[in-house]
């Protein structure tokens, strides 16, 4: 919704309400639209009158417990009877988070010999991650790290940095799983925002944000072999650059970046996403753009590391283990903490553990 006008958002909301009223659903329903920014035409792609992967993502992105509310509605309650924190009751709820959420798909074309890396209307992803940050740049870079593909930033993926601008632009003609990384290198080689827009139809805002990251990265790399000025490091961290990635750009040890950052008194803080219609339930995300709001307890704690995105050879069975480990540890009197970045899982439900951190695992 970062680039969709308030007027279009209101139209989408009003049409979704009319659709749900027409089919008579009581509970969770997700309606997916396509909007043509040129003609302003809106098309309904699909309607899922049930809990789905899309509704799970929406629930975790907004802190709105769709499954819990659906159960309350099924039991006979109405929206104006369900309490909802600062909104009073649920009928007055409107998502208004001061953070950015990004979903990034995980593909596995390398696992299938002869498979064509070409994206279209058919789903080819094997998993997905969700990242949260105060800004688009911060959330975007956290999403890349969450994929667990060995990449800690957008640059220098595969051999794209060795290709010319024209070769990179040619690779962008058809959408592939590497499109974001190719765009990044194309911008580094001098491609303009308009050139990338014409090839990809990705809105200018997102390409401009990526261009700013490229320019910032080039500035960081200009200090190769030396210590970064404090103000440059501070801005890099605010924009989501990982210590490990910065160390690669500077050709220094990662611990040198970490030590400099800590000497500056700069560390990530934890911000809550409040779960609507609950008294004090929240989950947390890290940011370098805020103040720490995570309360510390003196209870005995055990942290459970989640499985990350689903992939070939690793699926929901790993999450099953995490969930039951959390439930068993709760019974033993421990405060349980889960760290994960997969919105498809039960482990990232707000009530599976005492504290949930939506974070990259690496």
Which sequence ranges carry the predicted segments?
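ATP-dependent carboxylate activation and anion-phosphoryl transfer catalytic cores
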Residues: 1-221, 226-232, 236-240, 264-268, ...
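Amphipathic alpha-helical
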Residues: 82, 248-281
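Extended, domain-scale alpha-helical bundle/helix-rich regions
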Residues: 235-239, 245-252
């Amino acid at each position: 919704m970062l680039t969709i006008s308030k007027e279009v958002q209101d139209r989408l909301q009003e049409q979704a309400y009319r659709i749900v009223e027409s089919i008579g659903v009581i509970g969770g329903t997700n309606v997916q639209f396509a909007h043509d920014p040129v003609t302003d035409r809106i098309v309904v792609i699909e309607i899922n009158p049930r809990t789905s992967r899309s509704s799970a993502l929406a629930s975790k992105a907004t802190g709105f417990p769709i499954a819990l509310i659906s159960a309350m509605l099924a039991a006979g309650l109405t929206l104006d009877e369900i309490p909802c924190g600062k909104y009073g009751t649920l009928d007055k709820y409107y998502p208004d988070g001061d953070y950015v959420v990004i979903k990034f798909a995980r593909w596995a074309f390398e696992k299938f010999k002869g498979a064509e890396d070409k994206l279209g209307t058919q789903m080819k992803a094997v998993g997905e991650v969700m990242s949260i940050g105060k800004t688009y740049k911060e959330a975007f870079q956290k999403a890349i790290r969450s994929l667990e593909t060995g990449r800690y930033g957008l640059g220098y993926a595969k051999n794209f940095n060795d290709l010319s601008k024209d070769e990179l632009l040619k690779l962008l003609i058809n959408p592939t799983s590497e499109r974001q990384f190719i765009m990044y290198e194309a911008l580094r080689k001098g491609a303009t925002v308009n050139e990338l827009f014409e090839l990809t139809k990705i809105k200018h805002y997102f390409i401009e944000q990526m261009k700013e990251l490229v320019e910032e990265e080039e500035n960081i790399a200009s200090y190769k072999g030396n210590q970064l000025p404090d103000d440059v490091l501070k801005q890099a961290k605010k924009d989501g650059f990982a210590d490990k990635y910065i160390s690669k750009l500077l050709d220094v040890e990662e611990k040198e970046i970490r030590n400099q950052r800590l000497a500056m008194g700069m560390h990530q803080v934890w911000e809550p996403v409040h779960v609507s219609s609950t008294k004090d339930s929240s989950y947390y995300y890290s940011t370098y753009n805020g103040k720490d709001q995570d309360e510390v307890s003196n209870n005995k704690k055990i942290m459970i590391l989640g499985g990350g995105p689903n992939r070939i050879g690793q699926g929901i069975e790993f999450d099953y283990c995490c969930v039951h480990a959390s439930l068993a540890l709760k019974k033993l009197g421990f405060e349980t903490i889960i760290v994960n970045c997969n919105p498809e899982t039960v482990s990232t439900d707000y009530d599976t553990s005492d504290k949930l951190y939506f974070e990259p695992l690496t």
